[in-house]
A protein has these predicted regions:
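HATPase_c (GHKL) ATP-binding subdomain of two-component histidine kinases
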Residues: 49, 84-86, 124
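Cytosolic catalytic cores of cyclic-nucleotide second-messenger enzymes
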Residues: 5-53, 57, 61, 65, ...
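Conserved catalytic/ATP-binding subdomain
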Residues: 54-57, 80, 98
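Catalytic-core segments of nucleotide cyclases and related cyclic-nucleotide turnover enzymes
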Residues: 60-63, 93-124, 130-141
Length: 141
């Protein structure tokens, strides 16, 4: 996940408020995750959510649920309520050759596509015979 326009939040309200936003985002993501899932801060305003034992379809739906939750209610900070949206890149193990690194790369590229399309989206990175493709899942259109 990546917070849309996070630099603008830091620039307008300052880094301490930006930190409040990051903490609130982590809490909201954790509330929508299962007990077996793992949420970690990847750096800056980026998070990784590992969903063991899920299909790509299930992962997309969890990501969409989180995206809607974040965007539906402004985050209350010491500077007031701040509307926030996030973009999510999703990848799932699809073959025996998949590694943690290949999944991170595919999810990161999917996230980049989401940001290019204006943000506030879930984009799935899938493997095909022709190589990886990045698309909005049909069930989310």
């Amino acid at each position: 996940t990546d917070t849309d326009e996070f630099k603008a939040i830091n620039d307008k309200y300052g880094h301490p408020v930006g930190d409040e936003v990051i903490c609130a985002l982590a809490n909201r993501c954790n509330q929508k995750a299962r007990k077996v899932d793992f949420l970690g801060r990847y750096g800056g305003d980026e998070f990784i959510l590992l969903l063991p034992g899920t299909t790509l379809e299930d992962t997309i739906h969890v990501a969409e649920r989180i995206r809607k939750e974040i965007g539906s209610t402004p985050i209350v900070t010491s500077a007031g309520a701040i509307p926030v949206t996030i973009s999510l890149g999703v990848a799932s193990v699809q073959c025996d050759e998949d590694t943690v690194i290949s999944l991170l790369i595919r999810a990161d590229k999917a996230l980049y596509v989401a940001k290019q399309k204006g943000g506030n989206l879930v984009i799935a990175g899938k493997l095909t015979r022709e190589g990886p493709i990045f698309e909005i899942h049909p069930s989310l259109v």
